[in-house]
Amino acid sequence: MDYLDLGPYSSASGTVRLPGSKSISNRVLLLAALAEGETTITNLLDSDDTRVMLDALGKLGVKLARDGDTCVVTGTRGAFTAKTADLFLGNAGTAVRPLTAALAVNGGDYRVHGVPRMHERPIGDLVDGLRQIGAQIDYELNEGYPPLRIKPATISVDAPIRVRGDVSSQFLTALLMTLPLVKAKDGRTVVEVDGELISKPYIDITIRLMARFGVTVERDGWQRFVVPAGVRYKSPGRIMVEGDASSASYFLAAGALGGGPLRVEGVGRASIQGDVGFANALMQMGANVTMGDDWIDVRGIGHDHGKLEPIDMDFNLIPDAAMTIAVAALFANGTSTLRNIASWRVKETDRIAAMATELRKVGAIVEEGPDYLVVTPPEKLTPNAAIDTYDDHRMAMCFSLVSLGGVPVRINDPKCVGKTFPDYFDRFAALAKA
């Protein structure tokens, strides 16, 4: 097995420019593909998840021209030209869910599948929502999970569409992005959310990006959304992808644990991503954080004792960045509790189980619940722990921070970071000092 040994490091400082946001990159690619006109996308993330989206769009007949982190997309005016396609989408939820919805109303024969883990990640709530408007979608293996077979269908909207919001916000995102393509009797479609909507900031990203492409979604709280029906997305001409706020969390934590000063460029006060809220959680734990419109600085910890304060917080809004808090909790002077993180169980791996297992390897006492994690740090971190990463990019990046505790750590299968941040470990090593 491939592995990477890190540390021991005693400090971290410098400046890092973030790669483009995964969530924004894949949304913008699909919107540009469906729009009227040509869109130039800059700072597009180059990673496994964006590559599978680009490959799929190419197979669907979308004209794409890539040059470094810039991509010029020629829109299809709302309908893909390829009416049959077999689409492999890896483990990219940001590609599988929105593309499934767009294909369901495109009048073609499609197969959507991915890696084995993708076939364990639920999609039934989205399929149920699409079937309400007449979509013909069949499960190839297990009910409620990919692979999917999508067939031509007569699509019509007669009543509000209901979708569950408590498993993944990507189901709602997929519906919102697709519904403008569908005609409705009174020129609008209503989507109603059953249960509490999780990861609300990701829906905010979707609505803001749709607006950039000329389609305005009205919402009543987070339970009812009104989407214009039978309209065309219009290219904004140029659009820049902001830095990935989830990826920022590792460097911000490094600036706290390693003393800093460490500056992250590409996200800040003006960001449309909810995961910039990670900086506020870090401040609650005692880190010295300052923020500009598109940068965040961290300069160590503001306590004389030099340790973070423990935290007890609801992380429903920022589940991805919350993983970094779980590892930062190793450096606190007491027990931390991460609440409302049930969505971790259906991500790239069961992140609650994986995080509990690996935190114990470095000496933590961990209590694992259905939707919470309680982390009590050890007196001293266990050196030379071999961290398993479960083919989950965020597990690998989170546990790199252990090396800032003055102990070496081994990361197994480090290449899994290719999903969102292929050169993460090079960037981390450039900032960490022995």
From Swiss-Prot:
Family annotation (Pfam families): EPSP_synthase (PF00275)
Catalytic activity: 3-phosphoshikimate + phosphoenolpyruvate = 5-O-(1-carboxyvinyl)-3-phosphoshikimate + phosphate
Pathway in which this enzyme or protein is active: Metabolic intermediate biosynthesis; chorismate biosynthesis; chorismate from D-erythrose 4-phosphate and phosphoenolpyruvate: step 6/7
Source domain of life: Bacteria
Location of this chain's protein in the cell: Cytoplasm
One cellular-component annotation, GO: cytoplasm
Ligand binding (3-phosphoshikimate): K22, S23, R27, S168, S169, Q170, S199, D320, K347
GO terms, biological process: amino acid biosynthetic process; aromatic amino acid family biosynthetic process; chorismate biosynthetic process
Enzyme class at the top of the EC tree: transferase
InterPro entries found in the cross-reference section: Enolpyruvate_Tfrase_dom, Enolpyruvate_Tfrase_sf, EPSP_synthase, EPSP_synthase_CS, RNA3'P_cycl/enolpyr_Trfase_a/b
Record EC number: 2.5.1.19
Protein residues bound to phosphoenolpyruvate: K22, G93, R121, Q170, R351, R394, K419
Catalytic residue positions: D320
GO MF term list: 3-phosphoshikimate 1-carboxyvinyltransferase activity
Disulfide bonds: none
Alphabetical UniProt keywords: Amino-acid biosynthesis, Aromatic amino acid biosynthesis, Cytoplasm, Transferase
PROSITE patterns linked: EPSP_SYNTHASE_1, EPSP_SYNTHASE_2
SUBUNIT field: Monomer.
Family of this protein: Belongs to the EPSP synthase family.
PANTHER family: AROM/DEHYDROQUINATE SYNTHASE, PENTAFUNCTIONAL AROM POLYPEPTIDE
UniProt function note: Catalyzes the transfer of the enolpyruvyl moiety of phosphoenolpyruvate (PEP) to the 5-hydroxyl of shikimate-3-phosphate (S3P) to produce enolpyruvyl shikimate-3-phosphate and inorganic phosphate.
UniProt protein name: 3-phosphoshikimate 1-carboxyvinyltransferase
Organism whose genome encodes this protein: Burkholderia orbicola (strain MC0-3)
Primary gene name: aroA
